[in-house]
Swiss-Prot record:
PROSITE patterns: CONNEXINS_1 (PS00407), CONNEXINS_2 (PS00408). The keyword Transferase does not apply. This is Gap junction beta-3 protein. It is found in: Cell membrane; Cell junction, Gap junction. Residues 41-75, 150-188 are extracellular. One gap junction consists of a cluster of closely packed pairs of transmembrane channels, the connexons, through which materials of low MW diffuse from one cell to a neighboring cell. Keywords: Cell junction, Cell membrane, Gap junction, Membrane, Transmembrane, Transmembrane helix. The gene is Gjb3. GO terms for biological process: cell communication; placenta development. The chain crosses the membrane at residues 21-40, 76-98, 127-149, 189-211.
Length: 270
């Protein structure tokens, strides 16, 4: 697996992320990818080779190993890291789509035309939803993999001894011993803890995005009200003045004066 390419891709997401997203990316690379590459692969490298059983029955050791380890921890973590980082690619693709659309718009209408997007990487409109859905996908993937890890091995511990009973071709109950069980247990706890930290950071980032969106909507509503309030007050004052003028007029006006006003020419100032 080429981790350098994965790092380069995710570094592109970093410029569009919030503070929580940058911390999440640091945790993924420092506490998960580096530990996986440097240490965990070596600890689990001899997993099947040093899985020792007290039987000489051909095929029994392999069957017992497959029964207890349907999928190796190290491969499950590799899949988890790949699937967890994939939703971040949605953000990069969406930004690339915006930039391409902006480029075509400028080619068609010229460089002096108005921009479609003031900033293609700003989390507004559809990009905000893309970013939010990518966080939700990451959260679901983390929880699913933790559940799978806990279910397959009945917890996060690594026993020293496992027993295979009534499994063909093993003749009877066979005792098998796992290599480096304590070391594997420590790494399992460490990776589960790092995954839990990533889950907490993702939840915090989702809450931050929603809260920021709500506050921005409230501030927009207040600014709209402040702009529209002078117009409404001027209209109200005009109506009040007009009402006072009507009230100040004599309802019982002299009919003669009304006739004189009607016969007088209407003079308009030039």
């Amino acid at each position: 697996m080429d981790w350098k390419k994965l790092q380069d891709l995710l570094s592109g997401v970093n410029q569009y992320s919030t503070a929580f997203g940058r911390i999440w990316l640091s945790v993924v690379f420092v506490f998960r990818v580096l530990v996986y590459v440097v240490a965990a692969e070596r600890v689990w490298g001899d997993e099947q080779k040093d899985f020792d059983c007290n039987t000489r029955q051909p095929g029994c050791t392999n069957v017992c190993y497959d029964n207890f380890f349907p999928i190796s921890n190290i491969r499950l973590w590799a899949l988890q890291l790949i699937f967890v980082t994939c939703p971040s690619m949605l953000v990069i693709l969406h930004v690339a789509y915006r930039e391409e659309r902006e480029r075509k718009h400028r080619q068609k209408h010229g460089e002096q035309c108005a921009k479609l997007y003031s900033h293609p990487g700003k989390k507004h409109g559809g990009l905000w939803w893309t970013y939010l859905f990518s966080l939700i996908f990451k959260l679901i993937i983390e929880l699913v993999f933790l559940y799978v890890l806990h279910t397959l091995w009945h917890g996060f511990t690594m026993p020293r001894l496992v027993q295979c009973a009534s499994i063909v071709p093993c003749p009877n109950t066979v005792d098998c011993y796992i290599a480096r069980p304590t070391e594997k247990k420590v790494f399992t706890y460490f990776m589960v803890g790092a995954s839990a930290v990533c889950i907490i950071l993702t939840i915090c980032e989702i809450c931050y995005l929603i809260f920021h969106r709500i506050m921005r909507g409230i501030s927009k509503g207040k600014s709209t009200k402040s702009i529209s309030s002078p117009k409404s007050s001027s209209r109200a004052s005009t109506c009040r003045c007009h009402h006072k003028l009507l009230e100040s007029g004599d309802p019982e006006a002299d009919p003669a004066s009304e006739k004189l006003q009607a016969s007088a020419p209407s003079l308009t100032p030039i």
